[in-house]
Amino acid sequence: MKKLYSGFDLCAPTTSVSMTINGPAPMILAFFMNTAIDQQVEKHLRATGEWESAKRRVDKYFEGRERPCYEGELPPGNDGLGLGLLGVSGDKVVDAETYERIKTETLASVRGTVQADILKEDQAQNTCIFSTEFAMKMMGDVQQYFIDNNVRNYYSVSISGYHIAEAGANPISQLAFTLANGFTIVEYYLARGMDIDSFAPNLSFFFSNGMDPEYTVIGRVARRIWARAMRERYGAGSRSQMLKYHVQTSGRSLHAQEISFNDIRTTLQALYALFDNCNSLHTNAFDEAITTPTEQSVRRAVAIQMIISRELGLNFCENPWQGSFVIDE
């Protein structure tokens, strides 16, 4: 994990990691959090001038044992952050009080998402590693850890409708199943004794956007239903009423013939998502219908978002299709 994220400051506000894992999520999350904490330990040691003495302690720790190392050259712009403590935890090189302080600060600032929604696995993917009951328990354990350690900027689960849509659901069915799964998770966490306002802000959603007209409003409809249910059914506060969602353009809609035209489909779906005020967006590469994306197709997929964001004038006005100032004028 330290090699994987080396050079990326996991506590920087511009770094957000999506952990799209549907099996041993708590184990992988533990590796990730340890990596983030040890990065900050390394930064602390360098900033305080203690790095050389820490290196000597690490050398002594590995005396007579094989030491892990990064193979090959670092990519351009990669400063190797995180590689200094390969094979050793930060609590071995700083005192307990300093480590606990760094750990607390790290957990409060680290950003990302665990996409460990077992319910859509049952409904759409049929790739379950564990039983539904056990997987729900692990999801609850992750959320309880987030509550106990004030992990507020990391989503404990991405409640996913995308895979349901890819399995054949229309937009209305996708939304219905996804919200139902969300409320199921809410009820389960409440049954475990968690407070609604302690965990609801850690929930996020994930929708597909295809070509159907209902996709123009799927986000706002979801937000309206979620906000009213949170307020009126569960008595939740304003932050818990906010539904945050990611959109991925529809992989199912991509054609295997004339694949270059898929960029047109993806652009239209991206407009649906952005004009419906999604929080984040993934645009598919045009060749995903037949192969793993190439560098060229990935650049084109990114360019779709950049051109809409920086050059399309209508996108500069929030909510352009639904009673906005620019349309009224």
Identify the function of each model-found stretch.
Residues 268, 279-329:
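Active-site or pore-adjacent capping/gating segments
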Residues 103-105, 148, 236-238, 266, ...:
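Residue-level signal for the start and early helices of compact helical domains
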